[in-house]
């Protein structure tokens, strides 16, 4: 229990929505605990430090999944044995130093790979606990911060990845990845489908088109899925693509087995009410699906964290990788046409899922902050070369 005024500084990043969602889940949980003596502040470090350059990098990152896959692959897998080598290791250093001087946090929580934090822990000799919430299922070296107090990871296999590169096992906790509590709340699946004019006795295939960043080929996929899966109905989430929603709505408006939606705040209900989902393997999306025990098909995952997540889920029996739309259609047909494999996948997910990750992490954070010392004067520990950057 926090009995003295304490402050948690959360460093996150807006490269994709997942890191921000994790941050929000943790903030919401801490707020729900009504801790009068605790304040929580969030900062998108790279965006605040270098807004123009970071905006350019974000656009490249998003487009890399479509146009620059080999380039991103080279970036992601470069020098995996050199844990301290990262070309943007000092990116955001000035901003981070100023944040620590201004805010004087009692604990720093990273929900985004932040290599610059290792500069502080290795060279500044700060005495502030640093914790990290890893939002993927396989380790990448940029998640490692030397002398961290805690790492919160998704699975025991992820913990082994950390141990294998020399991280103290006692600092790594297998908690699962934090998501919104609503994904662990019971849903009346039958009523939800009825309310949306769908048949609760049919197998519902959920497709998240917005996840792929493309707007072509989905009409053929839907048509072929329905042709090869006799007892199926399809829910297509088009995201923010109004053009895709218009074209698909026009094509399937008279088909009672197809529901076309735009952006929705009800992914929780749709995941809970579907038997299979076609999506990209972003860490948070698949964790939400994992919580709802919905087997997933990963269509042409991009090299990097997406592919690593997909390979892990396939290895564990939670999902399958399809390199092409045609392969995805075949997998759907195989799983929905009286095959026990789908039931077995759901059962495996039920057995292996970790519940209430957000609550577990927040309780441990409070324990860490309860044992932390008063924040020291950061400036006194800053090396001479870095003091020129401090405002």
UniProtKB/Swiss-Prot annotation:
<dbReference type="Pfam" id="PF04101">
    <property type="entry name" value="Glyco_tran_28_C"/>
</dbReference>
<comment type="similarity">
    <text>Belongs to the glycosyltransferase 28 family. UgtP subfamily.</text>
</comment>
<keyword id="KW-1003">Cell membrane</keyword>
<keyword id="KW-0808">Transferase</keyword>
<keyword id="KW-0119">Carbohydrate metabolism</keyword>
<dbReference type="GO" id="GO:0005886">
    <property type="term" value="C:plasma membrane"/>
</dbReference>
<dbReference type="InterPro" id="IPR050519">
    <property type="entry name" value="Glycosyltransf_28_UgtP"/>
</dbReference>
<keyword id="KW-0472">Membrane</keyword>
<dbReference type="GO" id="GO:0009246">
    <property type="term" value="P:enterobacterial common antigen biosynthetic process"/>
</dbReference>
<comment type="pathway">
    <text>Glycolipid metabolism; diglucosyl-diacylglycerol biosynthesis.</text>
</comment>
<dbReference type="GO" id="GO:0009247">
    <property type="term" value="P:glycolipid biosynthetic process"/>
</dbReference>
<keyword id="KW-0443">Lipid metabolism</keyword>
<dbReference type="GO" id="GO:0070395">
    <property type="term" value="P:lipoteichoic acid biosynthetic process"/>
</dbReference>
<dbReference type="InterPro" id="IPR023589">
    <property type="entry name" value="Pro_diacylglycrl_glcsylTrfase"/>
</dbReference>
<dbReference type="GO" id="GO:0047228">
    <property type="term" value="F:1,2-diacylglycerol 3-glucosyltransferase activity"/>
</dbReference>
<keyword id="KW-0328">Glycosyltransferase</keyword>
<protein>
    <recommendedName>
        <fullName>Processive diacylglycerol beta-glucosyltransferase</fullName>
        <ecNumber>2.4.1.315</ecNumber>
    </recommendedName>
</protein>
<keyword id="KW-0444">Lipid biosynthesis</keyword>
<comment type="function">
    <text>Processive glucosyltransferase involved in the biosynthesis of both the bilayer- and non-bilayer-forming membrane glucolipids. Is able to successively transfer two glucosyl residues to diacylglycerol (DAG), thereby catalyzing the formation of beta-monoglucosyl-DAG (3-O-(beta-D-glucopyranosyl)-1,2-diacyl-sn-glycerol) and beta-diglucosyl-DAG (3-O-(beta-D-glucopyranosyl-beta-(1-&gt;6)-D-glucopyranosyl)-1,2-diacyl-sn-glycerol). Beta-diglucosyl-DAG is the predominant glycolipid found in Bacillales and is also used as a membrane anchor for lipoteichoic acid (LTA).</text>
</comment>
<dbReference type="InterPro" id="IPR007235">
    <property type="entry name" value="Glyco_trans_28_C"/>
</dbReference>
<dbReference type="InterPro" id="IPR009695">
    <property type="entry name" value="Diacylglyc_glucosyltr_N"/>
</dbReference>
<dbReference type="Pfam" id="PF06925">
    <property type="entry name" value="MGDG_synth"/>
</dbReference>
